[in-house]
Amino acid sequence: MIRVLAILLAALLGFSAALAQTPPAPAPSTDVRVALDTDAGRILIAVHVDKAPVTAANFLKYVDQKRFDGTLFYRGVGASDYGFVQGGAQNDPKRILPPIKHEPTTQTGLTHDDGALSMARYAPGSATGDFFIVLGKMPAMDAQPQQASGDNQGFAVFAHVVEGMDVVKAILAAPKSPTAGEGVMKGQMLAAPVTIRTARRVP
């Protein structure tokens, strides 16, 4: 009997030691995945609803209401592996929703690193349904609180590409129109914009 108890005690101690050595399971991700199916291929993104709740909710509203279906990637700035591509509603009054509150990178902790999605805007708080995808690292687009004058709020990152950066690079490398666009955007508009066929949540 004593021997049986000793064996059970040893087994329990071994089990307890194993539990103590087992690292805790990582917290489940709260990111929402969205597939942008374009004429150039699929771009799969993870939308950070926990870190950028206002901006993420706005983007997902466009997705759920199918407001991105049939829109375009229309702008490409930079080289083939550094810069950004821009797409979305293009201020189409039939597509855009009211502007949202600006969430700077100093608030969200997100940055304009490779594959980041961020909202296009004019003044802070004017973003609606246009966004851009970053290739490479572009810290100048982050909030710059040390900048004493002017707009130092940067752009609002809310998601990252998890698959399909080759598609993003192909869009950026596509030929640009020498005449389309106004002001700083002249020469940055794609000669043949890439259609976003659908934008859908995926598992």
Outline where the language-model segments fall.
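Cyclophilin-like peptidyl-prolyl cis-trans isomerases
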Residues: I2, A18-P203
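Bacterial N-terminal signal peptides
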Residues: L5-S16
